Amino acid sequence: MEKTSNTSKPLSRSEINKIIAVATGIKEKKIKEIFKYLNTLLLNELVSRSVCILPENLGKLRITIRNARYQKDMQTGEIRHIPPKPLVRYSPSKTIKETAAKVRWKYAD
């Protein structure tokens, strides 16, 4: 890896493509196509089955439905109905959870 996690900005898509291209010897354009196809595949899987397992032990995406609810407008006192809403939830894998637990936060004591 060229960049470390101590940088202030996260890696951009083009930087990720460059790093993968150098590491694998595949052209950046081909890597871009691979990611585009992977994106389409994951979206189709998510729509058709409501669950999508991400590759390389990254975790799982799933669609859940937020229940309908009532909300009171604090200014007018009017009670509004909020309909059910589909949400995409991400469940990280065990290795990601363990790695995140080891991260030293800059605001921690």
Swiss-Prot record:
SMART domains: BHL. Pfam families: Bac_DNA_binding. InterPro entries: Hist_DNA-bd, IHF-like_DNA-bd_dom_sf. GO terms for molecular function: DNA binding; structural constituent of chromatin. This is Uncharacterized protein MG353. It comes from Mycoplasma genitalium (strain ATCC 33530 / DSM 19775 / NCTC 10195 / G37) (Mycoplasmoides genitalium).
